[in-house]
Amino acid sequence: MYTAGYAHRDSSFSSTASKIARVSTENTTAGLISEVVYREDQPMMTQLLLLPLLQQLGQQSRWQLWLTPQQKLSREWVQASGLPLTKVMQISQLSPCHTVESMVRALRTGNYSVVIGWLADDLTEEEHAELVDAANEGNAMGFIMRPVSASSHATRQLSGLKIHSNLYH
């Protein structure tokens, strides 16, 4: 009985995320940069949040770029997640010091609907502004993925999503 409530929440959450994804892809007048802070031991919540949006963006003619520090995306996972295998590009083993610069370059080109990069440290104001400008110029979305371990969870900020949007400022 208790889990049924969670199952109901997950489906409504997924439905809400799908609606946000539709609105986001229909409103293509500006770029977006968001930071997603998540617990490494609970990756499913991040997938529930991002997959509907990534699936919707996969319908565009542009690529999706994943800048991963160590992990390599498996073809099976990409296909099982409903992402277009022919539009997903990955650069792995990327040094964290090059991630922001690579994201800026990729976002600016306009060749990618979304650029996803992993960073352990917070962005500086200058880095964030540079990413926002690049996303706007390329009419793309950028996600900064910031994993936190369960042990450091008590000392760091709670898992959450930072949405930087001019709609709220």
From Swiss-Prot:
Induction: By DNA damage, as part of the SOS response. The record marks 169 as: Essential for degradation by Lon protease. The keyword Transmembrane helix does not apply. The keyword Transmembrane helix does not apply. GO terms for biological process: division septum assembly; DNA repair; negative regulation of cell division; SOS response. It comes from the Bacteria. SUPFAM superfamilies: P-loop containing nucleoside triphosphate hydrolases. Residues 162-169 are annotated as: Lon protease binding. Component of the SOS system and an inhibitor of cell division. Accumulation of SulA causes rapid cessation of cell division and the appearance of long, non-septate filaments. In the presence of GTP, binds a polymerization-competent form of FtsZ in a 1:1 ratio, thus inhibiting FtsZ polymerization and therefore preventing it from participating in the assembly of the Z ring. This mechanism prevents the premature segregation of damaged DNA to daughter cells during cell division. This is Cell division inhibitor SulA. It comes from Escherichia coli O1:K1 / APEC. The lineage of its organism: Bacteria, Pseudomonadati, Pseudomonadota, Gammaproteobacteria, Enterobacterales.
